[in-house]
Amino acid sequence: MSFRCFSFALFLLLLTFISHVSASYIPNKKSFKSRSFKNQFLIPQNIARAAVGLRPLVWDDKLTHYAQWYANQRRNDCALEHSNGPYGENIFWGSGVGWNPAQAVSAWVDEKQFYNYWHNSCVDGEMCGHYTQVVWGSTTKVGCASVVCSDDKGTFMTCNYDPPGNYYGERPY
């Protein structure tokens, strides 16, 4: 099978995965480390990486704990602010409580349409940095977390990446 066919097949697999994930899945403290929760973050990111010929990310508990710590910091305000920590980071906010990890990853990966590889830049007026972090070639580990914010302010999710990516002037892969 050619690389293009393989990439297209992986893309279809990602769409199938996302369409079958329940929109009502909200992890509690006990389940934030569950295999299903991890896989909802990990599998679609690894499909996006495979589509551009990269090795899969490995789930990392240290990054997961950092992500959970930071998500807990955002619980009261649900603000889309980065932690400014030592890792690469993607953040997501959705109104209400019906959001799942695969939807957050889908929002990040959907930015691919705004990334111009040849110019190594985003289309004017669009974001693509979440996508480029997902597919950053030297990144090997990821850990993610989610919280439902206070006073019905929404759902906040974050993934942290090590080594970090998105270095100015460098292509992701």
UniProtKB/Swiss-Prot annotation:
Pfam families: CAP. Residues 45-161 form the SCP domain. Disulfide bonds join 78-149, 122-128, 144-159. One of its GO terms (biological process) is defense response. The keyword Disulfide bond applies. CDD domains: CAP_PR-1. Residues 1-23 form the signal peptide. InterPro entries: Allrgn_V5/Tpx1_CS (IPR018244), CAP_dom (IPR014044), CAP_sf (IPR035940), CRISP-related (IPR001283), V5_allergen-like (IPR002413). Keywords: Disulfide bond, Pathogenesis-related protein, Plant defense, Signal. GO terms for cellular component: extracellular region. Belongs to the CRISP family. Probably involved in the defense reaction of plants against pathogens. This is Pathogenesis-related protein PR-1. It comes from Medicago truncatula (Barrel medic).
